[in-house]
């Protein structure tokens, strides 16, 4: 349900009534549910949308003249006032002739129908999305390292067995040859270097085309259908950028940024430079046609069966554009999910959430100490009504120092944190094999990055049993499928991080990848648990006796408890 809370008040002592009126954006018919006063001028209620898509709702309040009149009469009678001729005459005007008890019956209906001095809020909007927008496990892979679409299709049963809900593919389009990057981001590519998939566009086509090395259009369609049959949705990357060989460079030169001398300006995000990519110019005089073309790209893939999009750097494009595009796409395909790759300022991250993005990458990757995690999670809890995080433990661009130096225990700890803190989380291929060698000591880039070369991949990493078990736990424990029920638990030291999800699950993780750690986890009385209660570790099968108050834990490097409370 959509929960409603509002402050509703006016001068004087009149009794008020309030409702929430709501409808699908496509409909003109309003539905209605009452709001109830909860004290101190606060009102609350809810409504249950019946379909996916955008909904409009408005809060309406008015003076209930009938209830106000009856309340005044009752208070005067209670005070012993017997001469109520004037009040009775007023009541007869409102209710018609009759006794006081009859007036009370009439008032109950009239107070809803007669909306005296009615006022309304501005019309508000809510996006109603399917469960995958809130809860899901993501796996990212480069299809060229798996034998193209046919090879990826063969991996689907194993991905489904491991408990993944979404398979995210970096761009699958033709790759430009002009200024192509070589191995490890070399400025000059060798003849057999495949280039970066984010350098989109070549003689074979642009954003609506498929790289021929990955397979045919039929191969792609079969992959999407096979994924859906296995319960694994295919997510595509939507990157608004073009290689120098993209067809749009010739067809629409006015869509691109140029220097004063007229030369094209390649993309930069200092200190990073992308000589193989040109950005589109959202200030172009032909912006309307540009918007339409980009919208049509998404609609093209929607019509091919794709309903999930990871959007590359949306914070560097026009916010009104995104609001328009998402609304237009969802008008035809309301189940479409947009995942923002927006590592940026909080105001922009939350704005993208409010204008339609289903979920977002976060700064989780860089929060590794107890203090960092606590501060970060409290921030996200404040955003919970409108912002859904997706905790990726790594990406092709991000190999954090904690993983580089911490080894397998660090990978285990971060996996447990991501999978049990956030309803949506993800891993990029290689994480399960503990891949952790950077291109340089001070870099977060992988050496021999898959962005610039083809690897031979298979689902055979030693971390996969833990991945599978965590995904099983997530599916069987509903409290892990929500974020707003997170409660951080106190510990005495700095190396054990603990938290509860509702009153059903408690988690403790050793953040130290080098040393075993002992600590005390404090279960607060506010959780309302018994003085003593059993807990069952869903990872190890061990049972313990815990209590409200202090509880001892001892964990190996990177180790964790995922406790089922009361089991």
Locations of regions flagged by a protein language model:
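Alpha-amylase-like alpha-glycosidases and glucanotransferases acting on alpha-linked glucans and related
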Residues: 194-225, 229-232, 242-459, 482-483, ...
């Amino acid at each position: 349900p959509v929960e409603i809370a509002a402050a509703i008040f006016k001068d004087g002592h009149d009794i008020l009534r309030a409702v929430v009126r709501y409808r699908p954006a496509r409909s003109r018919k309003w539905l209605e549910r009452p709001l109830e006063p909860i004290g101190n001028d606060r009102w609350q209620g809810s409504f249950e949308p019946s379909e996916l898509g955008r909904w409009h709702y408005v809060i309406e309040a008015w003076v209930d003249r009938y209830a106000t009149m009856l309340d005044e009469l009752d208070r005067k009678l209670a005070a012993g006032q017997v001469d109520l001729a004037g009040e009775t005459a007023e009541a007869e005007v409102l209710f018609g002739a009759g006794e006081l008890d009859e007036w009370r019956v009439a008032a109950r209906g009239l107070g809803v129908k007669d909306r005296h001095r009615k006022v309304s809020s501005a019309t508000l909007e809510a996006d109603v999305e399917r469960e995958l927008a809130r809860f899901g496990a993501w796996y990212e892979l480069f299809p060229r390292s798996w034998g193209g679409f046919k090879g990826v299709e063969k991996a689907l049963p194993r991905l489904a067995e491991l408990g993944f809900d979404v398979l995210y593919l970096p761009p699958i389009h033709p790759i430009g040859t002009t200024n192509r990057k070589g191995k490890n981001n070399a400025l000059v590519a060798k003849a057999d270097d495949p280039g970066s998939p984010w350098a989109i566009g070549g003689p074979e086509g642009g954003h609506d085309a498929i790289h021929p090395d990955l397979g045919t259009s039929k191969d792609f369609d079969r992959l999407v259908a096979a994924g859906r049959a296995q319960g694994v949705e295919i997510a595509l990357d939507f990157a608004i950028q073009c290689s120098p060989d993209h067809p749009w460079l010739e067809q629409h030169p006015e869509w691109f940024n140029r220097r004063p001398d007229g030369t094209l300006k390649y993309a930069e995000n200092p200190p990073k430079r992308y000589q193989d990519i040109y950005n589109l110019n959202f200030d172009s005089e032909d912006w309307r046609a540009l918007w339409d073309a980009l919208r049509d790209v998404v609609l093209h893939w929607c019509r091919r069966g794709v309903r999930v999009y990871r959007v590359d750097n949306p914070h560097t494009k026009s916010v009104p554009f995104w609001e328009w595009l998402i609304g237009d796409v969802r008008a035809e395909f309301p189940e479409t999910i947009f995942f923002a790759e927006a590592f940026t300022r909080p105001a922009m991250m939350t704005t993208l959430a409010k204008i339609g993005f289903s979920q977002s990458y976060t700064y989780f990757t860089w929060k590794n100490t107890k203090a960092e995690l606590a501060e970060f999670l409290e921030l996200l809890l404040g955003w919970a009504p409108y912002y859904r995080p997706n905790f990726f433990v790594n990406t092709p661009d991000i190999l954090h120092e904690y993983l580089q130096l911490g080894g397998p225990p660090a990978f285990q700890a971060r996996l447990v944190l991501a999978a049990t803190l956030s309803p949506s989380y993800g891993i990029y291929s290689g994480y399960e094999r503990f891949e952790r060698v950077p291109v340089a000591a001070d870099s977060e880039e992988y050496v021999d990055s898959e962005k610039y070369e083809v690897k031979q991949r298979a689902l055979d990493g030693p971390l996969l049993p833990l991945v599978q078990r965590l995904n099983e736990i997530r599916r069987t424990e509903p409290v892990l499928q929500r974020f707003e029920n997170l409660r951080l638990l106190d510990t005495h030291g700095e190396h054990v991080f603990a938290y509860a999800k509702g009153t059903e699950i408690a988690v403790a993780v050793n953040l130290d990848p080098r040393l075993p750690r002992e600590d005390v986890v404090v279960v607060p009385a506010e959780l309302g648990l018994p003085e003593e209660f059993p807990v069952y570790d869903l990872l190890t099968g061990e049972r313990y006796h815990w209590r409200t108050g202090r509880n001892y834990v001892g964990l190996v490097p990177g180790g964790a408890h995922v406790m089922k409370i009361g089991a």
